[in-house]
C-alpha cells in the first residue's frame, strides 16, 4: 500500500509517530505484502539502494543498530520484503520482517529506520488485546474496518492520537492536539492545545468582607443536617 510504504517507510527514521509494527489478520497477509512490494518497486525501482529517492541512515551508530536487527531477522529467515543493505552508502532499503510475538527485539523499541515488523493475529479483538498489553502508544493507526470496528478501536484503546486509513497525517493538522498519554508523554500542543499547555492558568478568588461563614471557626457547633443541605 502506498500510504504504508511511502508515508511510513520514507520518514520512519525521522519521526516518532511512524508505525512501530503492523498487525494483520491471516487472510490479508499475502495480498497486503504483495501490494506493499509493488508500491516499494514503484517508488524506489528494482534497485532501491541506488535510488535517489532513498535516504541515508543518519549516522554509523544508528546504521549498526539497524543492521544487527536486520541480519538477525535474515538469519532466522524472517525477511518478507527487501533486506538490501549497503554499509558504504549507509543505506537500508525498505524492509518488511515477520515477527511472532511482542517479545521480538524488533518490537522492543522505536526503530527509527526503514524496518517494518509484521505480526499476524487472528482478528481485531486479539489485536486490541495485544495493543492494551503494551505501553500506550503515541499514535495508533487503523486501515479499513466499518464504523463499528472503528469505534471499537477508539473506545477500547488508549493512545496519544488515532489516524484512520492513513499514517502520520494527524500531526499536520494544527487544529488537532498532538501529544502522548502515559509512557508516550503527557499533555499536548498544536493550536489552542499548545497555548493551553504552555500557559499557566492562575486561580484567583475574591470575596467581600461583609459576609462570612461562622461555621468555619470555633467553637464548632456543627449541624449535620445543615451541612448535608449545603453540600447538596
Where are these regions (language model features)?
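Conserved C-terminal structural/oligomerization subdomain of aldehyde/semialdehyde dehydrogenase
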Residues: 91-232
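Extended low-complexity, polyampholyte segments enriched in Ser/Thr/Pro and acidic residues
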Residues: 15-16
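Glycine/small-residue-rich pyrophosphate-binding loop that anchors the diphosphate of NDP-sugar donors
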Residues: 20
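Short, well-ordered alpha-helical segments in soluble proteins
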Residues: 8, 40-44, 202
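NAD(P)-dependent aldehyde/semialdehyde dehydrogenase
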Residues: 26-136, 142
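Single conserved hydrophobic/aromatic residue that forms the stacking wall/gate
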Residues: 1-6, 11
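Short glycine-/small-residue-rich flexible loop motifs, especially phosphate/cofactor-binding loops
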Residues: 1, 70-71, 195
Amino acid at each position: 500500500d502506498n500510504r504504508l510504504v511511502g508515508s511510513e517507510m520514507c520518514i520512519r527514521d525521522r519521526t516518532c509517530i511512524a508505525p512501530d509494527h503492523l498487525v494483520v489478520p491471516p487472510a490479508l497477509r499475502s495480498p497486503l505484502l504483495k501490494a506493499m512490494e509493488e508500491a516499494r518497486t514503484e517508488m524506489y525501482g528494482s534497485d532501491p539502494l541506488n535510488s535517489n529517492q532513498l535516504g541515508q541512515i543518519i549516522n554509523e551508530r544508528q546504521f549498526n543498530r539497524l543492521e544487527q536487527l536486520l541480519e538477525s531477522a535474515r538469519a532466522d529467515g524472517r525477511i518478507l520484503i527487501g533486506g538490501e543493505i549497503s554499509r558504504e552508502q549507509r543505506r537500508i532499503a525498505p524492509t518488511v520482517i515477520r515477527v511472532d510475538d511482542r517479545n521480538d527485539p524488533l518490537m522492543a523499541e522505536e526503530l527509527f529506520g526503514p524496518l517494518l515488523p509484521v505480526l499476524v493475529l487472528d482478528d481485531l479483538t486479539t489485536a486490541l488485546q495485544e495493543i492494551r498489553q503494551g505501553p500506550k502508544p503515541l499514535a495508533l493507526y487503523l486501515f479499513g474496518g466499518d464504523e463499528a470496528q472503528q469505534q471499537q478501536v477508539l473506545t477500547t484503546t488508549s493512545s496519544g492520537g488515532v489516524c484512520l486509513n492513513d499514517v502520520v497525517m494527524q500531526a499536520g493538522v494544527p487544529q488537532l492536539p498532538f501529544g502522548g498519554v502515559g509512557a508516550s508523554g503527557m499533555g499536548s500542543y498544536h493550536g489552542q492545545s499548545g497555548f493551553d499547555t504552555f500557559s499557566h492558568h492562575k486561580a484567583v478568588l475574591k470575596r467581600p468582607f461583609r459576609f462570612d461563614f461562622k461555621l468555619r471557626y470555633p467553637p464548632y457547633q456543627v449541624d449535620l443536617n445543615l451541612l448535608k443541605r449545603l453540600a447538596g
